[in-house]
């Protein structure tokens, strides 16, 4: 009842492209909605691949335990937590089930079958590591910065098609006086 809405006298441009930024610039902003970063995957963190989530709160279970709900039967899921570095800084990129399945090259059911055959859930994360570590990727998503560092909840994650030498030259041009 105390809100007033006033129409703008101008048109607002809608842009489907996310702004591309260097990691350091994006992190310094404190958080961004819909940003694009390009960098090399340095590591795929533990807790990637096949995971279990609490059916009540969605948190990832650790040894069958939810931090909030205790001992609980989890629901199967997949994710990737990757460290991406562009030379100016690093960010943790979190891929949901759909993006993880795309990266893995199969469904969660395929991944679970591979883990059963190997009798080891880590085979899925290991295969993803072999695919991405050391390669340059373009990531788009929402960036948040907190006490644990910077993270991006990815909406897109794909191998970069840019010339790495040209990107390196452009970066050096920006940072050299």
Residues covered by each model-derived region:
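Single-stranded nucleic acid-binding proteins centered on OB/S1-type folds
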Residues: 1-177
């Amino acid at each position: 009842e105390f809100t007033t809405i006033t129409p703008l006298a101008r048109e607002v441009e809608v842009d489907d492209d996310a702004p591309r930024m260097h990691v350091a610039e994006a992190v310094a902003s404190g958080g961004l909605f819909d940003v694009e970063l390009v960098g090399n995957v340095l590591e795929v963190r533990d807790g990637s691949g096949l995971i279990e989530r609490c059916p009540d709160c969605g948190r990832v279970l650790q040894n069958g335990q939810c931090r909030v709900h205790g001992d609980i039967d989890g629901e199967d899921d997949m994710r990737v937590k990757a460290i991406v570095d562009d030379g100016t800084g690093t960010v943790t990129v979190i891929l949901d089930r759909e993006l993880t399945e795309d990266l893995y090259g199969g469904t969660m059911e395929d991944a679970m079958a591979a883990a059963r055959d190997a009798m080891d859930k880590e085979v899925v994360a290991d295969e993803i590591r072999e695919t991405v570590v050391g390669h340059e990727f373009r990531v788009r998503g929402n960036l948040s910065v907190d006490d644990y560092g910077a993270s991006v909840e990815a909406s897109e994650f794909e191998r970069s098609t840019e010339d790495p030498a040209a990107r390196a030259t452009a970066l050096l041009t920006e940072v050299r006086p």
